[in-house]
Amino acid sequence: MTQRNILVADPQHSRGADMEGKPRTVVNVAVGILMRADGHYLLTTRPSDKDYGGYWEFPGGKLEIGETVEQALRRELQEEIGITIGQAYNLRVDMVDYPHALVRLHFCKVLDWAGELTMREGQDFVWTQLPCQASPILPGTLPVLAWLENVPADHNDAA
């Protein structure tokens, strides 16, 4: 899957090397775009104790050492929102340069899952459709929302 350009979030905030002067490490994150048959998709808020707390995003989380994107997505969605997902389809990969981290986002479409949504980290959630009305949106989520408006609904690549 080809990575797109780097999005610089909050360019007015400083970045740079880590404490030893080395370039920042890239954090890989699996992101699930859960879509219902009616075209609505799930957004959750980031927990208040994390960077960008309260911002809306697609659910997901960091890959652990040795995990594939799909394995991480399955684990994170079970841990964070209490569901077990079916097939995950790779959609796109974006790099986002946040002031606190350099993040590679692996976006996957998920069309089926089992279990009831349970926000285990105190998040809020909403089923919404395009154009998105939730606000504020996490900067790394904005390009994907715009892209989703222009991609066919049946666009899938197996993860």
Predicted regions: what is each one?
Residues 40-79:
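Conserved Nudix-box catalytic region and its N-terminal flanking loop in Nudix hydrolases
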Residues 36-39, 47, 111-116, 130-132:
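Short loop segments at secondary-structure junctions
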Residues 22-24, 149-159:
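Generic C-terminal helix-cap and adjacent flexible tail
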Residues 28, 78, 82-114:
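Active-site segment of metal-dependent pyrophosphate-handling enzymes
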Residues 10-13, 18-41, 62, 93:
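Conserved N-terminal beta-strand and adjoining loop/helix that marks the start
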Residues 109, 117-152:
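NUDIX/MutT-family hydrolases
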Residues 24, 33, 48-49, 95, ...:
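Short secondary-structure boundary/capping segments
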Residues 33, 43, 105-109, 127:
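Conserved hydrophobic/aromatic beta-strand scaffold that supports enzyme active sites
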